[in-house]
């Protein structure tokens, strides 16, 4: 059966539409649901969360731009995720979550067996919130670590919070993609994240656009990409105080390393084919 996708943006979701969505969730006939920026009555939101609990088909849920605002809605979402076992991507970008709201969601995040992509950008998180998120990075019994994490525009996070995240990434992280754009990271943060990038065996893309990083921070990133064997192939540094020349050098270095990796993979594949032929 071909599973459906439903995307509604910035509209009021009325009773008939809510019923249709709940029916699709109950019938396991929907794969992606996006209600980005939509207006949903409390009673209807609760119905959606009840249907989410037992749904076995939905893999991506987008509640960006305030759909989940309010302690009661966060509680209903958490209760749904405790039961749900199939969702792997949850987008809450632009939710008035704060550290307290995240704390309410954490028990469901920590036990969910398949949740691997999480967007908490512009969610008013602080250092306590970052500390909680760090617990989701390593794999545990019954749960893989996060594969993709978005923390854009959480400007209440201090250097201490970013340092904790960098340590968690360097230690046991499974992250492949990390989006930190439009945060107050600066050269100090660039330094601690440089250590994380050098230590990570999984990170492939990191976004530091508009993070107040200067030439000194850019030089630390260049040191990593030029001298350490990592899987990193994209480092976004636009809208910082880093010279175009240095950004170009970093980009060239990443491109060269990516080409070398492709050549190694091709050689390995050829060797394996030859071994099978023998």
Report the location of each language-model feature.
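Leucine-rich tandem repeat or coiled-coil scaffolds
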Residues: 1-278
């Amino acid at each position: 059966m071909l599973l459906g996708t439903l995307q509604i943006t910035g509209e009021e979701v009325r009773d008939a539409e809510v019923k249709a969505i709940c029916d699709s969730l109950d019938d396991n006939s929907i794969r992606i649901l996006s209600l980005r920026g939509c207006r949903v009555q409390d009673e209807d939101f609760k119905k959606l969360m009840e249907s989410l609990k037992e749904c076995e088909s939905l893999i991506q849920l987008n509640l960006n731009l305030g759909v989940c605002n309010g302690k009661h809605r966060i509680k209903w979402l958490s209760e749904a995720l405790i039961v749900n076992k199939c969702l792997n991507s949850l987008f809450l970008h632009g939710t008035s979550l704060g550290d307290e709201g995240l704390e309410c969601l954490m028990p469901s995040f920590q036990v969910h067996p398949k949740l691997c992509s999480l967007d908490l950008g512009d969610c008013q998180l602080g250092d306590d919130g970052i500390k909680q998120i760090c617990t989701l990075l390593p794999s545990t019994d019954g749960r893989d670590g996060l594969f993709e994490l978005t923390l854009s525009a959480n400007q209440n996070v201090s250097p201490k919070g970013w340092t904790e995240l960098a340590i968690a990434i360097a230690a046991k992280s499974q992250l492949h993609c990390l989006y930190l754009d439009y945060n107050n990271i600066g050269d100090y943060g660039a330094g601690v994240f440089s250590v994380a990038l050098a230590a990570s065996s999984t990170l492939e893309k990191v976004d530091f656009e508009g993070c107040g990083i200067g030439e000194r921070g850019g030089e630390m990133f260049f040191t990593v990409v030029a001298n350490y064997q990592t899987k990193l192939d994209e480092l976004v540094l636009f809208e910082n105080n880093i010279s175009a020349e240095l950004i170009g050098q970093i980009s060239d270095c990443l491109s060269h390393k990516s080409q070398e990796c492709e050549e190694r993979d091709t050689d390995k594949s050829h060797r394996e084919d030859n071994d099978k032929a023998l």
